[in-house]
Amino acid sequence: MNKNEFLYKLINYPGQLYRRIQIKLQKSMLMECGEQVRFGRNVEISWSNCSIGDDVYIGDNAIFLCAHAPLHIGPHVMFGPNCSIITGDHRMDIIGTYMSKVTVAEKLPENDMTVVIEGDNWVGANALILKGVTIGKGAVIAAGAVVTHNVPPYSIVGGCLLK
């Protein structure tokens, strides 16, 4: 190893150590965590309401918001960068009340619904999966897709507002 390689490794060592500790903490906060689960950088998940199966990769900058309804991710799933999953919604039918003023107690059951990703799936970059969706085993979600309805097993879907 030459001097430049040594200096490069020395400079990056604190960041690598921090990253290992961060991933260990992330896994410990999950409701359930399988083997060989890997997280990209800047991943934000509602940790205590999310279960992840074996051999799952979640790409950089993913945001999984599942505060009031759970998210279940099966085994062998890959998420590209910038994917989002949101298991909740805001109530918009209370006339004269700002959405930010509606309390959790005022939410309806249909405002928060479980998302299930059955396993053996590939979710492309910038995909958005919304509340109440089940993605069947082996299904592929194209980059940039907005998924609002269930996806059958072993299908390939893309585009906005999938039906």
Q: Where in the sequence are the language-model features?
A:
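Context-gated lysine
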Residues: 3, 9, 24-27, 101, ...
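Short, conserved clusters of charged catalytic residues that mark active-site
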Residues: 20-21, 68, 124, 142
